[in-house]
Curated annotation (Swiss-Prot):
The keyword NADP does not apply. The keyword Lyase does not apply. It comes from Rhizobium rhizogenes (strain K84 / ATCC BAA-868). The chain crosses the membrane at residues 4-24, 33-53. GO terms for cellular component: plasma membrane. Belongs to the UPF0391 family. It is a multi-pass membrane protein. NCBIfam families: PRK13682.2-5. It is found in: Cell membrane. This is UPF0391 membrane protein Arad_3976. Keywords: Cell membrane, Membrane, Transmembrane, Transmembrane helix.
Length: 57
């Protein structure tokens, strides 16, 4: 679980970089939405990993 949380966190960072760095307007909007989605998925997986108690990298 923690492995997936880290993967989604990295994806959200990449999407955030493209969304907030000033690329074109359409791409920035899509990247900001993806950033929010993957950040939420990261937090959900992180909470599930902590609650499971057997989170291994």
């Amino acid at each position: 679980m923690l492995k997936w949380a880290i993967i989604f966190f990295v994806i959200s960072l990449i999407a955030g970089f493209f969304g907030f760095s000033g690329v074109s307007a359409a791409t920035a909007t899509i990247a900001r939405v993806l950033f929010a989605i993957f950040l939420i998925v990261f937090l959900v997986f992180l909470i599930l990993a902590v609650m499971a108690g057997n989170a291994v990298l």
